[in-house]
Amino acid sequence: MFSKTISLFNISNAIRACAAALALFIAAAASSCLSHRDEPEPEPERPTPQIIFLFSPGGLGDMSYNDCILKGIQLFKNDNSDIDIYIYSPNSLEESERIFSDWLKRPESNIPVLFALASSDYEPMAEEYLSELALTPNKSILLFESLKEYADPNIHTFQISMYGASYLAGVTAAQCAGGKKSLVVLANNSDGPISVARDGFLDGYGSECDIEYLADDWTGYVSAPLAYQKMNTWAQEYGFIFPVAGGSNSGIYRYSREFDASPFLAGMDIDQSSLSTRITGSVIKNIDVLICQYLLEWIHTGTMPESQLYGLDSGYADWFLAPRYKEEFQPAVTEARRVAIEKEKEYYDTKAH
């Protein structure tokens, strides 16, 4: 009987202990539910944006325009290491078309993708394929060196005008040609932006100039051996050469380093005064800075300016005199700068009408 009493007493204590524990559990659970109800729902993780750059065929390594674009990409990547960037350097326009069309055909996804067509050569290709294939909502395009405006708000264009800077190059050339004619060397006769540079130089020079084209297509940008060969004749005939031919310019600069009897020259796209003592100055494009700013705006806002023209007064284009010639030519360049800006504006106003 005694043992049973002890047993019943222990059971009673156990029941009371369980009841107390259950009450504590229910209170804790209720408190937890209230706590979670007060907390905001976590935002879904945003997919990592992707950026694709399609360079001009054979363009990378030109120590000029394309390498300056690459520098801008690197500037952006330094502070945005989480963004996926893919770079294509095709060998031909046919390969470029395949890369671009394959991308356009990809199905819609939740990943934002920007495709940068980093050459004016791609404008006809873009027009052809975009007339047949619509962009899915997650896709955007940035077309370099184009003033075309598209109805699709996800297609953006820009052009850095070379007119004003080339006008100042022409002013400089007029002072150092030494009584000889000047020569404008262009990669081809179909690329709009380089024809703008030609027109600016001719207007600044103010006299008749000869014009030569290295090719009738994009290969004029990658024909350095041909340009080097032609310098044998050009060096005898001309007092100043204004070359707008991308990587082909390296053949001209190489000749001027190897032969003393070389004409004065202009550098192109970046400061190239270190490549030859005959380079009086360079038509520069600060496209590295511009591209970095465009990419930053896109990843933060999802958009960019639709169509923009950047001229001499924007700071993205300029005529940069080589240090060895600055004292001699800076007064004339400074005096002509305001005229160059006004002429550039008139040039585009006329083209718009």
Model-based region annotation:
Residues 297-353:
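Hinge/cleft segment of the Venus flytrap/periplasmic-binding protein
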Residues 158-181, 283-302:
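Hydrophobic alpha-helical segments within soluble ligand-binding/sensing domains
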Residues 51-72, 76, 87-97, 120, ...:
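Extracytoplasmic "Venus flytrap"
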Residues 73, 165-208, 306-328:
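An alpha-beta-alpha
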Residues 135-159, 270-278:
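Flexible loop/hinge segments that line or gate small-molecule binding clefts
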Residues 53, 109-120, 140-144, 237-247, ...:
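Periplasmic-binding protein-like
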